[in-house]
Amino acid sequence: YAFFGTDGKPCVSKGLHYAKMVKTYDDNGYVKTERYLDLSGQPTWHDGICGTDYIHDAMGNELENKPVGRDGSLAPGKLIIRNKYDRVGNCTEYAVFNLNGPALNSWNIHRCVMVYNSLNQETERRWDDVSGNLTTYNTDKYAIVRYKYDLLGNVVSTAYFGVDKKPVKCNEGWASTLNVYNKMGKIVKQSFFDINGNPTDPKVMVPVGICDYDKWGNMTFIASQDGHGHYIINPQTGWAILRMTYDSHGNCLSRAYFNVSDKPMANSDGYHKETYKFNNDNNCTEHAYFGTDGKPMLYYSIHRETYAYDTNGNQV
């Protein structure tokens, strides 16, 4: 493709800094090269490269991605990406190289290896350094992540492991999690565990989150628990339970907050409940706030906001 000015002449895009991008294709119809060109038809720089060379297999899987400079060699500061695939097209390895061989990317990773089960579901992902040793991913502390699935293909377990292949916490503060799903495939319970398999410390990560949905799939209930069936205050949100209601169009009509005893409480903004009303066009016409006693209250000196719309649905 190419860019043209109002005079009909070729021009350089101010944001992209090139006048034309051209591609070539291999015998199977997959992109072989991409080049950014200036007004003279010569390679020019865009985001640190002048283009990319690709290699694909017969199935169209990308085997190599090489960012290049003006002379077609590897662009300065860039890396060659090489991928491997299994017989059904699952990517089993991603690795980066420079002109001297194996290299590290900006996340300090040379290679990522993926493992799949007979249903083509990814069951493990691990990261290696240039020596083939396990290394931690980015700023996280794990080198391996493993997944388990139910018969419907939902992820029921995620677990992290360090370079010593022992359980380790991710940055969020948990080492493994278990998920329970309803018949609609929505999570109704999520449990988090530490490196010893015990419920996480609530100050670090809420041990259990439970939720429920209406028949349309709208979330109507979400709560935090301690791993032993008791409600707790989520230190991140400041409440234990949130209940929501909806109309038949999926518009949220109310949100209300409750404490560990399932009694009305105020959220961090100071109100217990907020309600909404909608017109036939599903435009919100009213937003109001209420206290723990169920009576109208002021939020930023306002109890109720109303909205009006013209015949085109524009707010007026």
Q: Where on the chain are the PLM-derived regions?
A:
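Buried hydrophobic residues that stabilize the cores of well-folded domains
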Residues: 1-316
